[in-house]
Amino acid sequence: MAIPPSSAPTSLAEAAAKIAEELAPDLVGVQECDYWLERSGNAHQIADIATSISTPYFAFAPSIIGTPGEKWRKLQASDKRMITNADSATQYEGSYGIGIASKIEVVKWHRLDLGNAPFGAPLLIAGDESGPGKPRMLYIRDEPRLAIAATLAHGYTVINAHLSFVPGYNLRQLN
């Protein structure tokens, strides 16, 4: 099962343009972000968002290598743990994670691995790949979770965290 169920290549650009027009943000945090995955047209999504909203600084931190809900693995010691605007021309293995894009200069990027629940949980899913339909329960195993932080030139640090969906375990990750 592909998550999300559909991936029109223009939807990301349209959403980013709408965000830029309506909110004019200096910084955006993105969760469930793809990097060179087939399901999203092999896009570097946080780089595309950064370009769409005119933010020169961005970073992507993969939580897994591969596609969630399909075939994936945890990061290994040899995997790149942070991909930034400084090294975005290099293509790494397709992955899924979180990112930040900023208009304000980022002086340092940080990554904090939060682990994952040792078990999954049933989730109510509406429909399937063919479209909306009767809701059904599907057992989903938890993926490794993380937080990414940007220390900005003016001294503030902004954090984007993608916590577990498993009740209780997500509260543990906040500690």
Predicted region positions:
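Hydrophobic pocket-lining residues within nucleotide cofactor-binding pockets
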Residues: C33, S63, V106, L114, ...
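Acidic/histidine-rich helix-loop elements
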Residues: M1-E14, P122-R141, S164-L171
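Membrane-interface segments of envelope glycosyltransferases acting on lipid-linked substrates or membrane lipids
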Residues: G66-K71, W109-H110, A117
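Conserved beta-strand positions
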Residues: V30, N160-A161
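Short, solvent-exposed loop/turn elements at domain surfaces
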Residues: L37, H110, G168
